[in-house]
Amino acid sequence: MTKSIFEYKDDQDWYLASFGSYNHLTCFGDDEAYEQYVDFFQGLTSTLDVSGFQLHVVKHSSDLRLVSFILDCLKEELGRDLVVTQHQGTLLVSEGDKLLYVHVPREGVSLDDFFGSDNKSDFGDVLLIATRNEGKTKEFRKLFGKLGIKVENLNDYPDLPEVAETGMTFEENARLKAETISKLTGKMVLSDDSGLQVDVLGGLPGVWSARFAGPEATDAENNAKLLHELAMVLDDSKRSAQFHTTLVVAAPGRDSLVVDADWKGYIGREPKGDNGFGYDPLFLVGNTGRTAAELSTEEKNEQSHRGQAVKKLMEVFPAWQNKQ
């Protein structure tokens, strides 16, 4: 069987190609030219899952002409319906309704040119944090920024309705908020629900932690209520408890991602420490004898339920996001 030889030749460009047992590139020119071609060649053939394509570059002036030649070869030999489109200095390779490869010139392109200055903010993955707390948002922005993801919060969407936390578990509440807001906005949404669980109280205050002493209760009132409930529990070992956090990430058309974590300790007999919030002044961390309110912010973030849950999330999030 005769092997097909493909050729394109004009005054500025001359390419030869065939199919063999492995991908291979040769060219006339210096090492710098070869490195430029081989990076492009390997990236394109790998992304398109092509094997056995052998290319020789005799003369080259146009990246568009080279890509068009390669795609013509693949169409004729393999029946691939690949199309190249020029866009603001880049070359976009698509097949059907899928964008498969983007070739950017070595000097790069302006983001304003590529996206359009009026629409640039609409591009790229966005994670909406279901909170109005700018401090919490800032921390998540640092973490997800490393993954190339823009982070927004509810302050960016003032017209969104409040989602009532009517669930009976932390996961139900976190899932309810994340999935509801995701449906309303069409965006990827992260929500959390956290609280204190005291074993001798059957897990209370649990999902009612913020309103244990009443709908508008202050931290001091909730702490006083908890001490009252434990007044007759004299054995310290019976005052075991844990802070719990559940994080849920929801996105349209996919199963939600759920992670959770606990921070174990005991309930003290009086508030201690000036840091933190909520039940921190009563929560004795493990067997340290120190309350969460006596820890520095760095110490707390390193070991707390929320810190542990966020670490778990960052470990599993990339795989979840890439899952089709």
Swiss-Prot record:
Name its co-factor(s).
Mg(2+)
Q: Where is this region: NTP pyrophosphatase?
A: 127-324
Molecular function terms, GO-annotated:
dITP diphosphatase activity; ITP diphosphatase activity; metal ion binding; nucleotide binding; ribonucleoside triphosphate phosphatase activity; XTP diphosphatase activity
* Example GO biological process: purine nucleoside triphosphate catabolic process
Catalysed reaction, written as an equation: XTP + H2O = XMP + diphosphate + H(+); dITP + H2O = dIMP + diphosphate + H(+); ITP + H2O = IMP + diphosphate + H(+)
Q: Name one Pfam family in it.
A: Ham1p_like
Residues that coordinate or bind substrate? 131-136, 194, 277-280, 300, 305-306
Q: Where is this region: Unknown?
A: 1-126
The alphabetized UniProt keywords are: Hydrolase, Magnesium, Metal-binding, Nucleotide metabolism, Nucleotide-binding
The kind of enzyme this is, by top-level EC class, is hydrolase
Cofactor: binding comment = Binds 1 Mg(2+) ion per subunit.
Q: Which protein family is named in the record?
A: Belongs to the HAM1 NTPase family.
**UniProt cross-references to PANTHER family, sorted A to Z:** INOSINE TRIPHOSPHATE PYROPHOSPHATASE (PTHR11067:SF9), INOSINE TRIPHOSPHATE PYROPHOSPHATASE/HAM1 PROTEIN (PTHR11067)
Which proteins does it associate with, and in what oligomeric form? Homodimer.
What HAMAP family does the record point to? Non_canon_purine_NTPase
Q: What does this protein do?
A: Pyrophosphatase that catalyzes the hydrolysis of nucleoside triphosphates to their monophosphate derivatives, with a high preference for the non-canonical purine nucleotides XTP (xanthosine triphosphate), dITP (deoxyinosine triphosphate) and ITP. Seems to function as a house-cleaning enzyme that removes non-canonical purine nucleotides from the nucleotide pool, thus preventing their incorporation into DNA/RNA and avoiding chromosomal lesions.
Please report the name of this protein according to its UniProt entry.
Answer: dITP/XTP pyrophosphatase
Query: What organism does the UniProt record list as the source?
Result: Streptococcus thermophilus (strain ATCC BAA-250 / LMG 18311)
